[in-house]
A protein has these predicted regions:
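Conserved phosphate-binding elements of NTP-dependent enzyme cores
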Residues: 1-825
């Protein structure tokens, strides 16, 4: 019997021609430091081959309509099942997506309301439920005799016919924000006080406004209420004006219609055709809850059917845990003849909901906009959707499923994994969390280092075998023998010695009103189970409040007060990808490439050939490769196969023409290298070569300090992992005095091996040493243990959370009976 997959000669990314056997029907964990080749093995080889081979069994017609993976760079892969992957960063959903649509629970609910609800006739009378609805028959109202049809499930969908006509099913309407129209009321209208007239309309409006009786030479704040009303809402009257163009010095007389400030924005919005146009307009807009559907997204007709006495929009506002109980009672609330159909529909709902409850998502409501969910919540939503159907013989590749999960949430995740294996599936688990790696039947450890020095299998075997293996780097963390307390935390009585940031909020989402103090100049970690309100408190309250205070703008509606004296900068460092195209590289983002271009332009070789610094740009310069326009890749359209991106045959992926290789720079040690050769080096090697080039060396040393020494200078930034992107964003901040700055990190340990977490703590310490205040949203216990101050939220998720249940030093949290986080410390 075949009990393992065989991989021979895998060379994807940095894999060093490895051979490895992977057990089938088991949970196989892949561990290793960041950049060691874990994802290359799991996604680049196993998933790529498993999904590709399955799709190749389909017809050409079907394959043309799918995004297909290209063949992996591997000599041989045997016995790989059809594969499904759950990626580390699920895509950010669109404005129309909700928790209900994303989990497809809303489909079952719409079916319930279409088939099982009491429907209302056009004259407002409710009919009893009957099988006539399911049969598609015409209904007759017993009170007024009117004939009508019950709505179908599609007519109850806010993405189809059931959408509110005012907001088109989004639940929000965009209205003009009067505060944004005049951002600085100390200016006069002549000086440009009315912002939309400067950017969206001819400057003529100032002259016409003067003709309307408004003084344009006094500060806007000193205008009368009537004058301000003319500016914002004045009538569209035609005025005869004398016009003088300052640029061309031409003058003339014109008849022109007045566009008030509000209409200027509305008119521009109606003509927007692309993202660029929207960018110009959206700064003058604010989003309000739709006044017609009150944010439910549904039309009045879609809100009329009643089941168990309530409408579809009311059901969608229930938390999932309450909704499951409500659905359980639906069949018994109906006539005997309706129950078999009701039980069938409700059963489909309950089986999907059970998975979501197991994964700890019972606190979410179906109407919650999917774009407001955290990464961890979106990932578990994706997992529940993938495992909904009880398949067998599938290979599930899970890329860091523990992201965003509190240690107490991991139990539900491991339960789902064991269920999948019990059903006859295989699991490949890429993760760093030792709590979840301990659930694996077999571990494959990649290493020994990142990048070019990685790509080898350094250890494999069962957990006990790995713990005994001297070559393993994860072993001390699995066995619990590694030291995890790595920095000297502030003493309890000195925590607030530098002052505090005070935040006061009213209710938002499921987060209750909060009063919170954050010590300045310290490392504060915000903890709590998934859905307890960490994101709402920090990303949706603290950051917008500080931003408003720093820029002298009105506070967001739910912020009561913010006191942050001396704070002039707020910086969010999150895991969103850097750049969206292949032209953004590590060297360009870190500001090294511009410096190198100047140095190469000063070289003897460049001077002899007449090259300037601009010629060394691979985006526009004379030395870029003409075959690929400096991207390093060429896209081939192969009709019935997916588009194939291959390294450019002219420059072999270097982005530069052959002439660039002839221009060499000589370093202090007498070594010579061209710019394309230098771009092919990793940061550590480049530091050695650039030892005598002060500015370049300093910038590269910061990347090394951030634990990014293994990245090559020419590596594309969109391909970096979340953790790498986060640390690269910090490159420009390290080394500056930061006493007026607050840095907020959203789960910076994503994708980090316990050894890499030590580097991250060193980064925090470097910021703290320069006076910064560091706030971290985190589940990683090693980061939490090293905090100066912890704010623990909970106790549960959703309505069961949203409160601060404990604050203090790690020791105080550990001793606090109310803190769930404390139990794991």
């Amino acid at each position: 019997m075949i009990d393992k997959m065989l991989i021979r000669g895998a060379k994807v990314h940095n894999l060093k021609n490895i051979d490895v056997d992977i057990p089938l029907g088991k949970i196989v964990g892949i561990a290793g430091v960041s950049g060691s080749g874990k994802s290359s093995l799991a996604l680049g080889v196993l998933y790529a081959e498993g999904s590709r081979r399955y799709l190749e069994a389909l017809s050409t017609y079907t394959r043309r309509r799918m995004t297909q993976a290209s063949k992996a760079s591997v000599d041989e892969v045997l016995y790989v099942p059809a594969a499904l992957a759950l990626h580390q960063r699920p895509g950010v959903p669109g404005i129309r997506s909700t928790f209900g649509t994303g989990t497809e629970l809303l489909n079952s609910l719409r079916l319930m309301y279409s088939r099982l609800a009491r429907h209302r006739c056009p004259n407002g009378h409710y009919l009893q439920t009957s099988l006539a609805v399911a049969a598609g028959k015409e209904l007759i109202c017993p009170e007024c005799g009117v004939h009508f049809y019950a709505p179908s499930a599609e007519e109850l969908a806010f993405n189809l016919q059931g959408a509110c006509s005012k907001c088109s099913g989004t639940g929000i309407v965009r209205t003009v924000d009067l505060d944004a129209l005049v951002p600085d009321d100390s200016l006069t209208i002549d000086e440009g006080a009315v912002a939309p007239w400067n950017s969206l309309m001819w400057s003529l409006m100032t002259d016409i406004c003067r003709e309307m009786g408004v003084r344009t030479d006094v500060p806007f704040r000193d205008l009368t209420a009537r004058e301000k009303d003319i500016v914002f809402h004045g009538p569209a009257e035609k005025k005869h004006i004398f016009y003088h163009n300052k640029n061309s010095n031409q003058a003339g007389e014109l008849d022109f219609t007045y566009f008030n400030a509000v209409y200027t924005v509305e008119n521009a919005l109606s003509k927007v055709k692309d993202e660029k146009g929207m960018k110009r307009v959206e700064k003058f807009l604010k989003e309000d809850i739709c006044p017609e559907c009150h944010g439910t997204r549904l039309s009045a007709a879609a809100r009329t059917p009643k089941l168990r006495g309530i409408s579809l929009d009311e059901v969608c506002a229930m938390t999932l845990i309450d909704l499951v109980g409500w659905v359980r009672g639906v069949p018994d609330s109906l006539l005997e003849e309706m129950r078999p159909m009701a039980e069938s529909i409700c059963e489909a709902f309950q089986s999907t909901a059970k998975r979501l409850l197991d994964l700890g998502l019972g606190y979410l409501t179906l109407d919650r906009s999917a774009s407001t969910l955290s990464t961890g919540e979106r990932q578990r939503m994706q997992l529940a959707r993938a495992v909904r159907n009880r398949t067998t013989g599938v290979l599930y590749v899970l890329d860091e499923p523990s992201i965003g999960l509190h240690p107490s949430n991991i139990v539900g995740l491991t339960g789902v994994m064991h269920d999948l294996v019990a059903d006859g599936n295989s699991i490949i688990l890429v993760d760093h969390d030792t709590q979840i790696l301990k659930e694996a039947d077999w571990i494959i450890e990649m290493g020994p280092e990142a990048g070019a020095k990685g790509g080898h299998v350094i250890a494999q075997g069962t957990i006990p075998a790995i713990e005994e293996n001297a070559a393993s780097q994860i072993a001390p963390f699995l066995s619990g023998s590694a030291e995890t307390k790595l920095r000297n935390c502030a003493a309890k009585d000195e925590l607030f010695a530098n002052g505090a940031v005070h935040l006061s909020t009213s209710q938002m989402h499921t987060v209750k009103p909060l009063e919170v103090d954050i010590p300045k100049g310290r490392l504060t970690v915000v903890t709590g189970v998934s859905g307890s309100g960490k994101t709402t408190m920090v990303l949706e309250s603290l950051i917008p409040a500080l931003d408003a205070q720093i820029n002298s703008r009105p506070l967001p509606p739910h912020i009561r007060a913010i006191d942050a004296q001396g704070i002039g900068h707020i910086k969010l460092i999150d895991a969103t990808p850097i750049g969206i195209n292949v032209r953004s590289t590590v060297a360009t983002y870190a500001g090294v490439h511009d410096e190198l271009r100047k140095l190469y332009a000063k070289s003897q070789d460049a001077k002899a050939r007449g090259y300037k610094a601009s010629d060394f740009s691979y985006n526009t310069g004379a030395l870029r490769c003409s075959g690929c326009d400096g991207t390093g890749v060429v896209s081939l359209d192969v009709q019935f196969l997916p588009d194939v991106n291959i390294p450019c045959s002219d420059c072999r992926g270097s982005r530069y023409a052959r002439a660039a290789y002839d221009v060499k720079l000589t370093n202090a040690a007498g070594q010579r290298a061209s710019l394309p050769e230098l771009m092919d080096m990793d940061v550590n090697s480049a530091i050695e070569f650039c030892a005598n080039m002060k500015t370049v060396r300093q910038k590269l040393s910061i990347l090394k300090q951030l634990g990014l020494g293994y990245l090559t200078l020419g590596e594309e930034t969109p391909s970096l992992s979340g953790g790498e992107a986060q640390r690269l964003k910090l490159a420009s901040e390290i080394g500056k005095t930061q006493t007026d700055s607050i840095f907020v990190f959203d789960e910076p340990s994503i994708g980090l091996h316990p050894l890499d977490v030590r580097v991250l703590l060193g980064v925090f310490q470097a910021l703290l040493d320069h006076g910064a205040t560091v706030i971290v949203i985190e589940h990683d216990l090693d980061v939490i243990r090293n905090a100066d101050y912890i704010i623990d939220m909970g106790p549960g998720g959703g309505d069961a959370g949203g409160r601060i249940i404990a604050t203090g030093t790690p020791q105080e949290i550990q001793n606090n009976k109310n803190s769930i986080t404390g139990r794991y410390l």
